[in-house]
Curated annotation (Swiss-Prot):
Binds 2 heme A groups non-covalently per subunit. Binds a copper B center. This is Cytochrome c oxidase subunit 1. Fe(II)-heme a binds at residues 61, 378. GO terms for molecular function: cytochrome-c oxidase activity; heme binding; metal ion binding. It comes from Gadus morhua (Atlantic cod).
Length: 516
């Protein structure tokens, strides 16, 4: 029974649960790797060994957090669970392909871990730039295994994207237009389109790198007429949309949570929110070279990428102020998901502001590859994506399980986590402005103070992670069942009770459209 249910599942709820469990587990691995990094940097001098092993840990930390934590949780977990419920579909459009999308991830994860176990590991950073990722600087199978791992994760995401696009467009009731679907549905739709358009470019780039390493081609080798800068263009044409893929589903979840706990029946400016997400999705594809301001592009090219990058701040601002407008005048229920959502709005905005700073090509020449960049993207990921995941988890946990989390404990957990991540990443702005470079395992004594503070912050975050595991255990042990759900008419996913039956919407939903 367990084997047929969990290994061969074609049920969106079960596959969503598999994604949530896998993502949580990978999150533990990624957190462990990050704590190794912060332990190494807690004081000057070596702890783990040389820079190679350090960079292997950094690289693995990035890949694990991006491909095996954030994406499986947001898109695979919440997407699978909520989207069919929100549009009244009996399941995903391609339920068996959905199962395959999930089961490609554990082998992919295995290949990534294997890459660290053979030879010297892949100490390239998650960007895998040649010539460092070439077969001279990284002889052996490590980088090849990493590339195969990325191939599997990429296929998984492409199949998932096809599935979500088909489901969202074709499986809603005929009477409902796309502009009547909830914002989370829109967010995942736009995310899926971004995945579908960007991942093939990454696949091309890393396949060319694979043949450069093993088949003696010279796509990225100047000796044979190639150019390593070509790889950077291919990688970042994927890499920049990828960072929007990581945050867009979070935008959708935050919209739902802010509206729900403000006592509003809809978020402020629904159409503005949709168009803002579409604008972010489009602009995300035409700003990639802002990651390459230091490789010697023309001044007019740099001017274009600076301006285009700054334009993204406009739709992002539309979203931030719409969330604040949703809160305005509401009867606010100060429950934990709202705390996570407010933390998201504030800290994501801070991360966005440092992003505007980095968009200036002149300033980026100085700040590129310093801890200022690390601080910037960890504010939008570690306090944007992760806070959105936590908000969504605490909010929808009763829907998934039928049990409620302990109210006071989750609030304490939020407080500890909030202090921990800010103490970890805020000082890194100072280190970056003082010129401390990224991806080095050691540093001059002058940088000791803020590195020590940052590492203490990481230990506080670790306490929060352990506290979260306790909260989960407590909820399943206490078994406080959900009594009643409010506002089901504007939050359709709750309509079937907590937890919903194994099969929902087995016959088409009846939708009555009001005509004035």
């Amino acid at each position: 029974m367990a084997i047929t249910r969990w290994f061969f599942s074609t049920n969106h709820k079960d596959i969503g649960t598999l994604y949530l469990v896998f993502g949580a587990w990978a999150g533990m691995v990624g957190t462990a790797l990050s704590l190794l990094i912060r332990a190494e940097l807690s004081q000057p001098g070596a702890l783990l060994g040389d820079d190679q092993i350090y960079n292997v840990i950094v690289t693995a930390h990035a890949f694990v957090m991006i491909f095996f934590m954030v994406m499986p949780l947001m898109i695979g977990g919440f997407g699978n669970w909520l989207i069919p419920l929100m549009i009244g579909a009996p399941d995903m459009a391609f339920p068996r392909m959905n199962n395959m999308s999930f089961w490609l991830l554990p082998p992919s994860f295995l290949l990534l871990l294997a890459s660290s176990g053979v030879e010297a590991g892949a100490g390239t950073g998650w960007t895998l730039y040649p010539p460092l990722a070439g077969n001279l600087a990284h002889a052996g199978a490590s980088v090849d295994l990493t590339i195969f791992s990325l191939h599997l994760a990429g296929i998984s995401s492409i199949l998932g994207a096809i599935n979500f696009i088909t489901t969202i467009i074709n499986m809603k009731p005929p009477a409902i237009s796309q502009y009547q679907t909830p914002l989370f549905v829109w967010a995942v739709l736009i995310t899926a389109v971004l995945l579908l358009l960007s991942l093939p470019v990454l696949a091309a780039g890393i396949t060319m790198l694979l043949t450069d390493r093993n088949l003696n081609t010279s796509f990225f080798d100047p000796a044979g007429g190639g150019d390593p800068i070509l790889y950077q263009h291919l990688f970042w044409f994927f890499g920049h949309p990828e960072v929007y893929i990581l945050i867009l589903p979070g935008f959708g979840m935050i919209s739902h949570i802010v509206a729900y706990y403000s006592g509003k029946k809809e978020p402020f400016g629904y159409m503005g929110m949709v168009w803002a997400m579409m604008a972010i999705g489009l602009l995300g594809f035409i700003v990639w070279a802002h990651h390459m301001f230091t490789v010697g592009m023309d001044v007019d090219t740099r001017a274009y990428f600076t301006s285009a990058t700054m334009i993204i701040a406009i739709p992002t601002g539309v979203k931030v102020f719409s969330w604040l407008a949703t809160l305005h005048g509401g009867s606010i229920k100060w429950e934990t998901p709202l705390l996570w959502a407010l933390g998201f709005i504030f800290l994501f905005t801070v991360g966005g502001l440092t992003g505007i700073v980095l968009a200036n090509s002149s300033l980026d020449i100085v700040l590129h590859d310093t801890y200022y960049v690390v601080a910037h993207f960890h504010y939008v990921l570690s306090m944007g994506a992760v806070f959105a995941i936590m908000a969504a988890f605490v909010h929808w946990f009763p829907l998934f399980t039928g049990y409620t989390l302990h109210d006071t404990w989750t609030k304490i957990h939020f407080g500890v986590m909030f202090v921990g991540v800010n103490l970890t990443f805020f000082p890194q702005h100072f280190l970056g402005l003082a010129g401390m470079p990224r991806r080095y395992s050691d540093y001059p004594d002058a940088y000791t103070l803020w590195n020590t503070v940052s590492s203490i912050g990481s230990l506080i975050s670790l306490m929060a992670v352990i506290m979260f595991l306790f909260i989960l255990w407590e909820a399943f042990a206490a078994k406080r069942e959900v009594m009643a759900v409010e506002m089901t008419m504007t939050n359709v996913e709750w309509l079937h009770g907590c937890p919903p039956p194994y099969h929902t919407f087995e016959e088409p939903a009846f939708v009555q459209i009001q005509t004035r």
